[in-house]
Amino acid sequence: YCNGGANVDTQIACAIAHANEYLNLFKNDLIILEKIIQKTEFTFGIGTSYFLEIAKLRSFRSLWSTIITQYISIENIETKIHAINSNLYYSNKDMYNNLLRATTSGMSAVLGGCHSLSLLPFNSNSLGNEEFGQRISKNIQLLFQEESYLNQVKDTSKGSYYVENLISIINKFKNLSFDP
């Protein structure tokens, strides 16, 4: 939804509504429903709004937990999220600025709690030398993991006033109920 230009509220609402449809199909078979919930993985496009993207993933996780509890009572279900940076924000004229865009969007995805991350090469919108761009994208991910240890802390942005405030704004539609 991100590459289509959807805002954060729309991305979250569409993902939850789409997944809720699948849960509705199997609501009468709790064994299958539990397996589906445990194996579900969501993919989100990540834009360039650093704090908003962190809040988006954290907000989605809490809203999805609310939806799950309407179907079955499972505790500690881990919401698996795959994040991929959006090339919607990549520049064709100055592709080296895309390095910064990829790094900040990737870092916001990791701080938001994604389980896996794909970074598009900074030169994916231009022709030539894709191998170099792929290598740099891989190195950025290795920097997150091996140099900054972002994978060692479970919720690095928890307690941040600004991020928590953004989450409360995004969660304004939390009281909406999806019928199981």
Segments and roles (model prediction):
Residues 1-109, 120-141:
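Helix-rich catalytic cores of soluble enzyme domains
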